[in-house]
């Protein structure tokens, strides 16, 4: 019994010594200054927010780059964004044979602006009133590398 008690006491001392030895290196904590993101605006050409435009104007805007700036007109770089093209397509009811209009959505994620040539061509071939071009989840970076969301940009063709 004496042997077991001595063995347990020795193990306890050994565990205590190793646990206290690990506490000597303390981790350094870095504190960051709070950052209040400025109010950003997303523009394409001279348009921002939700705008009604003609298909001809939309065609000319497709080749332009998205611009992100704050209220003081400081430019920000685009980290990424999503683009959605909601187009009008015809569908046929198989039972009645009647053709009706509905919408189809094409969307993708991009990291550079303007849109790639392939996407510009896909959108340009069918631009009609009632369709939508939507830039959303626009993420901008400032000069210090901080990321922030910029407002969405939506074009409705009429």
What name fits each language-model region?
Residues 6, 11, 47, 71, ...:
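Generic structural motif
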Residues 74, 78-100:
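Contiguous segments within soluble domain cores/interaction surfaces
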Residues 27-84:
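Contiguous beta-strand segments within globular domains
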Residues 91, 95-157:
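Mature extracytoplasmic or organellar-lumen-exposed domains after removal of signal/transit peptides
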Residues 1-26:
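Bacterial Sec-dependent N-terminal signal peptides
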Residues 25-38, 145-158:
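Short beta-strand elements
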